[in-house]
From Swiss-Prot:
Catalytic reactions on record: 2 reduced [nitric oxide reductase rubredoxin domain] + NAD(+) + H(+) = 2 oxidized [nitric oxide reductase rubredoxin domain] + NADH
GO molecular function terms noted in the UniProt entry: oxidoreductase activity, acting on iron-sulfur proteins as donors, NAD or NADP as acceptor
Organism whose genome encodes this protein: Escherichia coli O81 (strain ED1a)
GO terms for cellular component: cytoplasm
Cofactor: FAD
Main location: cytoplasm
Purpose: One of at least two accessory proteins for anaerobic nitric oxide (NO) reductase. Reduces the rubredoxin moiety of NO reductase.
EC number: 1.18.1.-
Location(s), subcellular: Cytoplasm
Pfam families in the cross-refs: Pyr_redox_2, Rbx_binding
Flavoprotein found in the keyword field: yes
Identification of the protein by name: Nitric oxide reductase FlRd-NAD(+) reductase
Name of the gene: norW
Length: 377
């Protein structure tokens, strides 16, 4: 490979791929291009920065320069890729272009911001860069409104509450974590958030935001209003597919790839939050780690299909942490819930009494690995 591998992106997926490639090949040319600084940070830490009093710069684990030196890379930070000429094997920015033999899209996903009047007043916490832009406002805010009661929204609500702020969480579902599990399973965490002082406005919808002299006025449905100092959108992520679309690749929710992480173009691959693997978008660390291991082999000619095992998803709510696995969102499961002082074990079984999903909390999270072994896939 005279031109080597070009990777667009510098997040967790890109870094895992670089590390796995370098374990097998120390000299193949590797080029990374990204719009950010390319400094390394741990993205899940963003759910806890406020209670821990961390600034954006405190999150940096390794600078871009250190990364380049350690892994023998060419890095192009603060660079927006504008186009991909798949036929000519060329990646283009406004001022530069790079030839590639193999190209990897690791462009991640962007936070979805609800399209309501005043949406420009909403903050997002999907990157170190986004936190840097709003850290002063968030640190100074006394009253915080979080839009979305999913995984990130629940983590942020608890963190801001632990930092002593008045927190309101709004979601149009009837319970928190509604896309991940039924209400009878999420109720333990929901009750804990309420106990801590989080004001939950469920079955509610944001209509608009307006700047006032004393803060931000949020208008909700049923003619309700609330004034706050900061509004955070935690309403899910959308895979970044614009570049792939311009390159003529097949797109669905994400960039469509097969079990080899290969797109509809034989020399272009996708990895991480932007990828849709055989119809599934999996924006969690473990599938990204496993995908990066497989993709490194495939890029170097050792074709290996990705086989994902049953995997844990961790909800980092320190006052009541949860681990879950399996098809927790399935509507046809029968849930067997055992609750004790030290925690909860909820088992979701199908009509044949096969374990299809589980959720464990607190001290009973240690039972997760045993349950994983009995999970039917």
């Amino acid at each position: 490979m005279s031109n080597g591998i070009v990777i667009i992106g510098s997040g967790f997926a890109a870094r895992q791929l670089v590390k796995n490639i370098r374990k097998q090949d120390a000299s193949i040319p590797l080029t990374l291009i990204a719009a950010d600084s390319m400094d390394e940070y741990n993205k899940p830490d963003l759910s806890h920065v406020i209670s821990q009093g961390q600034r954006a710069d405190d999150l940096t684990r390794q600078t871009a320069g250190e990364f380049a030196e350690q892994f023998n890379l060419r890095l192009f930070p603060h660079t927006w890729v504008t186009d991909i000429d798949a036929e000519a094997h060329v990646v283009k920015s406004q001022n530069n272009q790079w030839q590639y033999d193999k190209l990897v899209l690791a462009t991640g996903a962007s936070a979805f911001v609800p399209p309501v009047p005043g949406r420009e007043l909403m903050l997002t916490l999907n990157s170190q860069q986004e936190y840097r832009a709003c850290e002063t406002q968030l640190r100074d805010a006394r009253r915080v409104l979080i839009i979305g009661g999913g995984l990130i929204g629940s983590e942020l609500a608890m963190d801001f509450c632990r930092a002593g702020k008045m927190v309101t969480l709004i979601d149009n579902a009837a319970s928190i974590l509604a896309s991940l599990m039924p209400p009878e399973v999420s109720s333990r965490l929901q009750h804990r958030l309420t106990e801590m002082g989080v004001h939950l406005l469920l079955k509610s919808q944001l209509q608009g935001l307006e700047k006032t002299d004393s803060g931000i006025l949020a208008t909700l449905d049923r003619q309700r209003c609330i004034e706050v100092d900061a509004v955070i959108a935690a309403t899910g992520l959308r895979p970044e597919t614009a570049l792939a679309r311009r390159a003529g690749l097949t797109i669905n929710r994400g960039v469509c790839v097969d079990s080899y992480l290969q797109t509809s173009n034989a020399d272009i691959y996708a990895l991480g939050d932007c990828a849709e693997i055989n119809g599934q978008v999996l924006p969690f660390l473990q599938p990204i780690q496993l995908s990066a291991m497989v993709l490194a082999k495939n890029l170097l000619g050792n074709n290996t299909p990705l086989k994902l095992p049953a995997m844990l998803v961790k909800i980092k709510t320190p006052e009541l942490p949860l681990h879950l696995a399996g098809e927790t969102q399935r509507q046809d499961l029968r849930w067997q819930i055992n609750t004790e002082r030290q925690g909860m074990v909820a088992r979701g079984v199908d009509d044949a009494d096969q374990l299809r999903a589980f959720v464990v909390s607190e001290d009973r999270m240690k039972e997760a690995f045993g349950l994983l072994k009995t999970l039917s896939m």
